[in-house]
């Protein structure tokens, strides 16, 4: 049993998003808290304070992680510390180049949200999204 330090943490690489999903504060541009990108130096400080107890790191909450230009650097940093990493994305920023960089970063798990099998259904959830681009 472990006391005092979390072994799982969920962080938000950014509050920004390229889509306008109706159920999300990021998509609605309706945050009631500070917004922006997680700074790499703050991220490293957080990991150093958590020490070697952290086992599982979720890079996601209410923004598109790939918008943060330092996202994959942070994943790589956590990976080198032996931390299991996971993220969720809308998939619009994935291309051959950053797909390769994502693999090389050591990201352990990626969830690509696809909410529908036709453009009409998909865009009812993922406003301004392009299903063809994601698939």
Model-inferred region functions:
Residues 1-109, 120, 124-125, 129-132:
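Conserved alpha-helical substructure of the radical SAM core
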Residues 112-114:
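Conserved phosphate-donor/acceptor-positioning beta-strand/loop module used by diverse small-molecule
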Residues 117:
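Flexible loop/hinge segments that line or gate small-molecule binding clefts
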Residues 135:
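Conserved active-site region of classical short-chain dehydrogenase/reductase
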């Amino acid at each position: 049993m472990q006391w005092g330090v979390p072994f799982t943490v969920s962080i938000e690489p950014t509050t920004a998003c390229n889509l306008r999903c109706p159920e999300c504060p990021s998509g609605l541009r309706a945050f009631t808290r500070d917004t922006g990108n997680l700074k790499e130096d703050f991220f490293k400080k957080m990991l150093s304070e958590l020490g070697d107890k952290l086992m599982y790191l979720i890079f996601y909450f209410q923004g598109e992680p790939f918008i943060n230009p330092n996202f994959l650097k942070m994943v790589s940093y956590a990976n080198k510390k032996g931390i299991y990493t996971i993220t969720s994305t809308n998939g619009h920023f994935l291309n051959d180049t950053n797909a390769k960089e994502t693999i090389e970063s050591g990201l352990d798990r990626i969830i690509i949200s696809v909410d529908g099998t036709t453009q009409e259904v998909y865009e009812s959830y993922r406003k301004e999204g392009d299903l063809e681009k994601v698939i």
